Amino acid sequence: MSIKGVPTDAARPMADLIVAGEHTVASRGLARQQVADLTLFAFAAGESVSEERYPADTVYVCLEGTLAVTRGGEQALVPAGSCLRVREGVGHAVSGVGGSAVKFLQVNA
């Protein structure tokens, strides 16, 4: 698997690798292979993604802010530095908590 967009010269905070403009959702693919997809996301305050389903397990790693993952009407909070797995095929939506901006890494494998 080839990973791109991650510094090799010096360590940097992962959250600094992506920025969302006002009223936007930004994404940056780091790797896309048959075995796994790694994508950085930055949601501006108040932005969200409605329910989606993936054919593989999804791991969310929150980098800044608090990510809300809603599955079957139940919301799980993922604060910065924490992670949560959603099993394959389970519909879920993601957003920042309380209308705040959030940055996270999404891993599908």
What are these regions (language model features)?
Residues H23-T24, D37-Y54, E88:
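Conserved short histidine dyad/triad with adjacent acidic residue
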Residues M1-V35:
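A short, N-terminal "cap"/entry segment at the start of jelly-roll beta-barrel domains
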Residues A42-A44, R53-V69:
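Short, conserved beta-strand element in jelly-roll/cupin
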Residues G73-G89:
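Short acidic-glycine-tyrosine-enriched beta hairpin
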Residues T66-A68, Q75, G91, A101:
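Structural motif
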Residues E88-A109:
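Ligand-binding loop in jelly-roll beta-barrel domains
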